[in-house]
Regions:
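Class I SAM-dependent methyltransferase SAM/SAH-binding core
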Residues: 65, 69-113
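Conserved class I S-adenosyl-L-methionine
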Residues: 54-62
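Class I SAM-dependent methyltransferase Rossmann-like catalytic core
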Residues: 21-40
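A short glycine-rich, Lys/Arg-flanked "PGG" loop and its adjoining helix->strand segment in the class I
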Residues: 139-151
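Conserved alpha-helix/loop element of class I SAM-dependent methyltransferases that forms part
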Residues: 36-52
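A conserved beta-strand element that flanks and buttresses the S-adenosyl-L-methionine
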Residues: 125
């Protein structure tokens, strides 16, 4: 596996070879998509919000790319990923087995958000997940992520833009092709409102255009003495 260095900037050039090698047991189309994903997903803007030595929960981890990257660059002490897709988790576990430190990663199959491990984490991450969740369930998912964020910890939320225009259309077409879903994008203002209701404070907000896509990034912090200090979901 071509490993990125701990001081990598996590740019596409840094990561494409790493992700291609990481999924060597996957079908060729998945390997190519994994190698191309750094050109679309702004890993370079997500990673800096993960503190050194953190315990990380990735809700909707898919094939485990983000957690694998965080271990490879020696960023985290432990990572737990969960997803509804058993095949994706199989690739995630295979990828972890190719990494030094991969034993610090665990991947759990869940049926619903209620199945997510009930423990506090320094960082909870949710990347390109919420738009796949039925609209009536989205607030519950954000609340569950917030409750699993340790006091003083951060909740990192990244999803696609809901602003009308070509970038939203590009992502809608992308999901039709690859996920066979006609999705309804998530309002970042709604996420901010739900997170605030769980006692989280917004500390960073970015709009990130990449290729034909548009991303919204929101980072929230749970006050050290804030509400919902335990993971009681």
């Amino acid at each position: 596996v071509r490993l990125p260095s701990p001081d990598t900037a996590c740019t596409p050039a840094d990561l494409r070879g790493f992700f291609y090698d990481l999924y060597e047991d996957a079908p060729k189309p998945l390997r190519l998509l994994s190698a191309a994903r750094p050109y679309v997903c702004p890993y370079d803007r997500i990673v800096p919000f993960v503190p050194q030595g953190a315990r990380v929960l990735d809700v909707g981890c898919g094939t485990g790319a983000l957690l694998a990257l965080l271990v490879a660059i020696e960023r985290i002490a432990e990572g737990v990923g969960c997803d509804v897709s058993a095949p994706a988790l199989s690739f995630a576990r295979g990828a972890a087995g190719r990494l030094a430190g991969g034993e610090r990663l665990r991947f759990d199959h869940i049926e619903t958000i209620d199945g997510v491990v009930d423990a506090p984490f320094d960082v909870v991450v949710m990347v390109d997940v919420l738009h796949h969740v039925p609209e009536a369930e989205r607030q519950k998912v954000v609340a569950a992520a917030a409750r699993r964020t340790a006091p003083g910890g951060v909740f990192i939320y990244k999803d696609m833009t809901d602003e009308p225009g070509g970038r939203r259309l590009a992502h809608t077409i992308d999901d039709l092709i690859f996920s066979h879903e006609l999705v309804r994008q998530v309002s970042p203002e709604a996420v901010e409102h739900w997170a605030a209701g769980e006692g989280l404070e917004l500390v960073a907000s970015e709009y990130l255009p990449r290729l034909v896509y548009g991303h919204v990034l929101r980072v929230f912090r749970k006050p050290a003495d804030g509400p919902n200090a335990g993971a009681d979901a």
